[in-house]
A protein has these predicted regions:
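Short, surface-exposed, charged loop/turn segments at secondary-structure junctions
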Residues: 126-135, 169-171
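Catalytic/regulatory signature loops of cyclic-dinucleotide turnover enzymes
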Residues: 134-158
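Short catalytic/binding micro-motifs of nucleotide second-messenger systems
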Residues: 56-58, 95-105, 141-146
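Short amphipathic alpha-helices in soluble, non-transmembrane regions
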Residues: 87-94
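Catalytic NTP-binding/metal-coordinating core of nucleotidyl cyclase/transferase enzymes
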Residues: 2-85
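Intrinsically disordered, glycine/charged-rich C-terminal tails and inter-domain linkers
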Residues: 1-5, 151-197
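Catalytic core of nucleotidyl cyclases, primarily class III adenylyl/guanylyl cyclases
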Residues: 59-83, 102-130
């Protein structure tokens, strides 16, 4: 006997194909210890800094997918945007905007960023996929938390380090990255961490 599933359930068994995206996850350190008003300001500052970073690379906001994470966000970047552009100028411009805020603000906003790429799905609720999960695990990994010494720390996946970072495009300095082992939930893999200046 064959049971025919209702139409919505058939979709879940065979979802539409994934999209390849670069994935930038930004997380505000210590966010949960702040008052609600401080959290609201920090989220606004971060949103503006991310917008300005992508604007510096000529990326239209309408092309970006965003997923709110409460204390940060995941930005899903279309494949036509070079990973080199994300590493320079997007991330340096984002950090520059953050530092301008921090020059006069208390508490300072300190962030962890992860950069990965892979296949993701978009549904009625946002974005989903194991590569997005990996980017989120990287930003939360203990070596990345411990590596946040200044305003920002960046972790890139091993595949992104090997395919882009190690070649030293533009102002990207491969020597600034240290290899770490990430063991966060289902993710067990090497990654590369650098202080962002």
């Amino acid at each position: 006997m064959t049971v025919e599933l209702p139409r919505p359930w058939r979709w879940f068994r065979h979802p539409p194909g994934p999209e390849y995206r670069s994935i930038l996850v930004v997380d505000i350190a210590g966010f949960g210890r702040w008052s609600n008003p401080h959290q609201i300001v920090a989220r606004d500052v971060l949103t503006t800094a991310v917008r300005d970073g992508f604007r510096a690379a000529g990326v239209r906001q309408a092309d970006l997918g965003r997923q709110d994470r409460g204390d940060g966000m995941a930005v899903l970047i279309p494949a036509h945007v070079s990973k080199v552009d994300i590493l320079d100028p997007v991330i340096p411009e984002l950090i520059s905007r953050l530092r301008r805020h921090n020059a006069t603000a208390v508490p300072r906003i300190r962030i962890r960023l992860s950069l990965h790429a892979g296949e993701v799905h978009r549904d009625a609720h946002g974005w989903v996929g194991s590569d997005l999960n990996t980017a989120c695990r990287l930003v939360d990994a203990e070596p990345v938390r411990a590596g946040l010494l200044g305003d920002a720390v960046l972790v890139v996946s091993d595949v992104l380090y090997r395919s882009v970072v190690r070649h030293g495009y533009r102002r990207v300095d491969p020597a600034a990255f240290s290899r770490v082992e990430v063991a966060e939930k289902e993710v067990r893999e090497p990654a590369w961490v650098a202080q962002v200046s």
